[in-house]
Regions:
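Residue-level signal for inorganic ion chemistry
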Residues: 4, 71, 322, 368, ...
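Hydrophobic alpha-helical transmembrane segments in multi-pass membrane proteins
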Residues: 39-41, 159, 214-384, 445-498, ...
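Hydrophobic alpha-helical segments of integral membrane proteins
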Residues: 174-193, 200, 208, 216, ...
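N-terminal leader/targeting segments
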Residues: 1-63, 181, 279
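Non-globular, low-confidence helical/coil segments that flank catalytic cores
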Residues: 72, 96-99, 114-131, 142, ...
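Aromatic-rich juxtamembrane segments at the membrane interface
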Residues: 152-283, 288-289, 573, 648-653, ...
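Membrane-interface helix/helix-cap signal primarily in integral membrane proteins
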Residues: 44-227, 535-536, 544, 581, ...
Length: 742
């Protein structure tokens, strides 16, 4: 089914008739013998997955435009104070009176003197007029897929604006009930346990991971234990153990299981249908159901059944980090510990228990390794060593959290476990922060097919199959597989294979960022306002930055340096135009320059006539001249002529039109100044440079229209194309558009 869903996301809806015909043919196999029926079942499951993938990837969406909207606030209101942006998830949504099947992602902005409206509380039903839009998918290689992230939450549309916002009478809404309960429980945990302990408890009990500050989540990632912040089978297992303890007076085993099952389902509902919580509850619910029916419970069967059930209702979950981590960990623990368990059982007392804990910890770290590499691009070297200690600490903490939560209706009784929870939580977080700051990690690229194959070979070598009477002979047979798998996995420490010369203009909206690659050499020109996609690309390809060019110090060109530094991407050298620090630069850029210097980056200023040798190419600074001074940073923006493989690229930053004549030289490709605005790029400038192609980084439709009106050159807009990729060789170049490649 997983393979079918993955395929379904890649094929158009026109493939549906062919799937139906294939399913009919596969159904005929069910009439055959046992093996033929098994093959038919496998094929039908694959085709079902493909159909689910196609339907999820190509949903029917309401039209874009203004609409009268009603909905229920299904979670905490997220307020980004630095931008004045409010983000809300809505459920039970209607557009112009018509109910839609999915939720909505709603954003709007507050003015400097405005507060969040009083009607925006978790569980509240509201009404407003807003603009409906369809979320965009991935716009850059290895970039963030906003549309996919929303699909994983069963959200298909976005809403912008909050005109005529008003509260409506609360109706019967399960989402509203769950949101109000979640909010009340989270507030109670903070009141009883303190702010930090309450945030951590809300994350691990109620699925409110966003309650934990970003800097603390980063420390968990550095230690390779980010998965313990999401509700999982481990967290729900502690709840099951606690319920079993409370139900000890109930002697009948089937009755205990029958009482536990609805409690688990109620817990999944009260988390607001949080996907990780539902997944974990589903795992344990299947275990309880099997025991009620006196069936032998095999964890591999439970894992497969729970995965199939969840994917049938939410196919997009296949591509979520939490889904991959949960099933990676559980599969590895079930498989690998079955091999090591006999050895642990032979060791009596504390030695056997320690060996069992270490084997489970190692299996968990191995199971989560591929998702960690894909999503975070690093190998935590202390993972196995600290996993046993921190998971044991989390076990104790979860017990305290549950006891505190269950006793909150009696405040004086909850005070004692609340104080203990606060002390243990603060100690736990302090330990995580200390270990996280000093924990060594290996920076890696994104796993490719060879790395995945290596992981599968190692996993297969550790599985308990093919037992031999001679233990050494059995191990000897596995060693080549283990060595080959480890060797393939080690290739992830190398940069991604690449040859030739390539320039890529990233889609950054009304901001700028570009990457020029030649073999192993990397040049970055500006970093955008938010450098998440740029950092993701460099991390996924395992590329340190040889030279960073900041055309000027406005945040839409230099602000993204923050994400490069946060991701630990090395920047060896940085250049900016002479006089950049005398112009009206954005103050938030100064700390970023200081951080680069602290990390060992060499920062220089350049002016007209300076030539920067880079790889086999040449970079000539055309503007500003030495001693140039301007109050407007755009007036002093650097213009750069890049010559590589016999192709000339003219990069103009945000250079103002009145100074464009000083940078107007012949070029094959021109990157339009100031996002294609009239005060940046003029017809005279394009006539002088005479390019065959013009690139513009913008989110405005009229920018490309303006440029097409003043030049006969081909105009490529990031709004229309996503990332624009230019491949150069032997004096020729080709242009590819990421949107078309997708």
């Amino acid at each position: 089914m997983m393979a079918g869903i993955a395929l379904g996301f890649q094929v158009p809806t026109s493939a549906m008739p062919m799937l139906c015909v294939s399913a009919a043919l596969a159904g005929l196999l069910l009439l055959g013998r046992r093996r033929t029926r098994a093959a038919g079942c496998l094929l039908l499951t694959f085709l079902l997955g493909a159909a689910l993938g196609i339907r999820t990837a190509n949903p029917t969406l309401p039209p874009e435009g203004d609409a009268q909207v009603t909905g229920v606030v299904a979670g905490e209101v997220d307020f980004r104070e630095e931008k004045g942006q409010v983000r809300v998830i809505l459920r039970d949504v209607t557009l112009n009176g018509e109910r839609i099947a999915s939720g909505a992602y709603w954003t709007f902005y507050l003015k400097a003197d405005e507060n969040i409206p009083d009607c925006l509380t978790p569980g509240a039903r509201i009404s407003m007029t807003a603009e409906v839009y369809h979320p965009q998918g991935q716009r850059n290689p290895h970039g963030y897929d906003f549309r996919q992230a929303l699909r994983q939450k069963n959200i298909l549309i976005g809403l912008y604006g909050a005109a005529k916002l008003q509260a409506l009478p609360d109706g019967l809404s399960l989402y509203g009930l769950a949101a109000r309960f979640n909010h009340r429980m989270a507030q109670t945990l903070r009141d009883v346990c303190g702010e930090k302990a309450g945030q951590l408890a809300s994350a691990v009990l109620l699925g409110m991971r966003d309650e934990v500050p970003d800097e603390e989540q980063e420390q968990f990632r550095r230690l390779g234990i980010a998965h313990i912040l999401s509700v999982s089978g481990f967290h729900v297992g502690v709840l099951v153990a606690l319920l079993a303890l409370l139900m000890m007076p109930v002697k009948h085993r089937r009755l205990r299981m029958a009482l536990t099952l609805p409690m688990l389902l109620a817990y999944a509902f009260l988390t607001g249908g949080n996907a990780p919580a539902v997944r974990a509850v589903l795992l344990w619910a299947l275990v309880c159901w099997g025991r009620i029916r006196h069936k032998r419970v095999l964890m591999p069967h439970v894992l497969c059944a729970s995965a199939m059930i969840q994917l049938m209702f939410a196919p997009a979950q296949l591509f979520s980090a939490s889904f991959q981590m949960t099933y990676g960990v559980m599969a590895a623990i079930c498989g690998i510990t079955a091999q090591t368990a006999p050895n642990a059982q032979k060791k009596r007392g504390w030695k056997g228990k320690i060996l069992s804990l270490l084997s489970v910890s190692a299996a968990a770290q191995f199971g989560v390794l591929l998702p960690e590499l894909y999503w975070f691009g690093r190998v935590p070297l202390l993972g196995i060593a600290v996993n046993v200690l921190l998971v044991a600490g989390m076990n104790v903490l979860l017990l305290l959290d549950w006891v505190t939560l269950l006793l909150t209706p009696i405040p004086w009784l909850a005070a004692l476990p609340g104080a203990a929870t606060r002390a243990v939580s603060e100690g736990f977080l302090h330990l995580v922060n200390v270990l996280g700051r000093f924990a060594p990690t290996l920076w890696t690229r994104q796993p490719d097919a060879w790395v995945v194959l290596g992981w599968l070979l190692v996993f297969a070598a550790l599985l308990p199959f093919g037992k031999s009477r001679n233990r050494w002979q059995n191990r000897k047979k596995r060693l080549p597989m283990l060595a080959a798998g480890a060797a393939l996995m080690a290739t992830i420490l190398l940069p991604a294979p690449f040859s030739g010369t390539e320039y890529m203009q990233l889609d950054m909206g009304d901001a700028d960022a570009a990457v020029l690659r030649q073999e192993k050499h990397v040049l970055v020109v500006d970093a955008g306002e938010y450098g998440g996609d740029l950092a993701s690309y460099l991390r996924a390809e395992h590329l340190p930055v040889d030279l960073l060019v900041l055309t000027h110090l406005h945040s839409d060109h230099a602000g993204g340096v923050r994400e490069l530094l946060d991701e630990g991407i090395p920047i060896r050298r940085c250049v900016m135009p002479s006089g950049a620090l005398e112009a009206d630069f954005d103050e938030e850029v100064l700390p970023l320059l200081a951080r680069m210097e602290e990390n060992g980056t060499v920062i220089e200023t350049v002016c007209r006539g300076d030539i920067l040798q880079w790889a086999e190419g040449k970079l000539t600074v055309l503007f500003p001249p030495e001693g140039f001074s301007a109050s407007n940073a755009n007036d002093g923006s650097m213009a750069l002529l890049v010559e590589a493989e016999g192709v000339k690229l003219l990069l103009t930053g945000d250079l103002s039109a009145r100074y464009g004549q000083y940078a107007a030289v012949s070029a094959d490709v021109v990157k339009a100044a100031h996002h294609g605005s009239k005060n940046g790029t003029t017809q005279a400038f394009l006539d002088e440079s005479a390019p065959t192609a013009v690139l513009v980084s913008t989110k405005r439709e009229n920018a490309a229209d303006y440029l097409r009106g003043i030049t006969d050159a081909d105009v490529y807009s990031t709004l229309e194309s996503g990332a624009i990729i230019i491949r150069m060789a032997d004096g020729h170049f080709t242009i590819e558009q990421f949107e078309e490649m997708q």
